[in-house]
Design a protein with these regions (language model features):
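Walker B catalytic acidic pair
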Residues: 182-184
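Conserved adenine-nucleotide phosphate-binding loops and their immediately adjacent elements
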Residues: 77-90
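Pre-Walker A (pre-P-loop) alpha-helix and adjacent loop at the N terminus of AAA/AAA+ ATPase modules
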Residues: 90-120
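Walker A/P-loop nucleotide-binding motif
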Residues: 112-134
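Interdomain "pre-motor" coupling segment immediately N-terminal to P-loop NTPase/helicase cores
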Residues: 32-80
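Short glycine-rich substrate-engagement loop in P-loop NTPases that contacts/grips substrate
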Residues: 97-104, 123, 138-178, 187-195
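Short, flexible, mixed-charge glycine/proline-rich loop motifs
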Residues: 18-30, 46-49
């Protein structure tokens, strides 16, 4: 009975691990991988039979495939729209090198900054690339298997309202490695949403969960005099994001520049 089970297991392994071009038989009579030169067979001490084993490069390839799978899953949770996954440092056109470099360095130093609960505040006019850099940070960190979520506040509020136990939402929020709050200040200024925004920022602040915020609100407004929750929201953001970064360029909207550069045929057809 045992021999049959063993034989079946060996035959099944042989189907999965086969000799490939470049593989060779070593001096010990075992099959070796032609790429990494590690054994693809092993002799059982039990009965002296050769059994297939996974070579080193196949193990590394399998690990990398598993990592990429996990990164894809994390990215699908992180973003609402597939297009957001295309915002990467590799696709950055380099319109604002200083901001790009700061965002890259944030990712490179994330382990250290995360322990301190420090995030990044990107502020500036419409269309200058604030969201792009926030998404690029999220993409870079999910690729390193960090749990990240990107939200706009109204979207976050709907998710909060539609859930069963609301406390579970905040438990999930502070379990993240990074939260990205996109377009702060663009949401409807209602009492309920302002109160919710404070609760979100306060939960992240108290748990030292780092967050990246993008906003069209000026630094003067952020540091100005406000009453109640709005004042406490901005104070907590500025404490956790101590070096606000202005995202702007003399040429104006990056979004408009990108569209022009990426559609030369359209421009040619219109004669512009």
């Amino acid at each position: 009975m045992f021999d049959k089970v063993l034989n079946d297991a060996i035959e099944a392994a042989k189907q999965n691990i086969r000799a490939e071009e470049g593989d060779y038989i070593g001096e010990d009579g075992l099959l070796y991988c032609g790429r990494c030169n590690t054994a693809k067979e092993h002799i059982l001490s039990l009965n002296g039979r050769k059994v297939p084993v996974i070579c080193k490069c196949t193990q590394e390839r399998d690990r990398e495939e598993a990592r990429r799978r996990q990164a894809r899953e994390l990215r699908s949770i992180c973003f609402r729209y597939p297009e957001q996954t295309e915002a990467t440092f590799e696709s950055d056109a380099g319109y604002i090198p200083k901001v790009s470099e700061a965002a890259k360095r944030y990712c490179e130093s994330f382990d250290t900054l995360r322990k301190k609960g420090l995030g990044m505040l990107l502020y500036g006019p419409f269309g200058t690339g604030k969201s792009f850099y926030a998404y690029a940070i999220a993409n870079a960190l999910t690729d390193r298997l960090y749990k990240v979520r990107v939200w706009q506040l109204e979207q976050m509020y709907r998710e909060f309202e539609s859930g069963g136990r609301r406390s579970q939402f905040f438990d999930y929020l502070v379990s993240l490695h990074l939260a990205v709050i996109d377009d702060l200040g663009a949401e409807k200024q209602t009492k309920e949403l302002t109160s919710f925004t404070f609760n979100v920022i306060d939960a992240l602040y108290c748990s030292r969960t780092p967050f990246v915020v993008t906003t069209n609100v000026t630094l003067k407004e952020l540091t100005g005099t406000h009453d109640g929750d709005r004042r406490r929201i901005y104070e907590r953001i500025l404490e956790r994001c101590p070096c606000p970064i202005l995202v702007d360029r003399p040429e104006g909207s990056i979004r408009y520049t990108r569209v022009r550069e990426e559609n030369p045929e359209y421009r040619s057809l219109l004669g512009i």
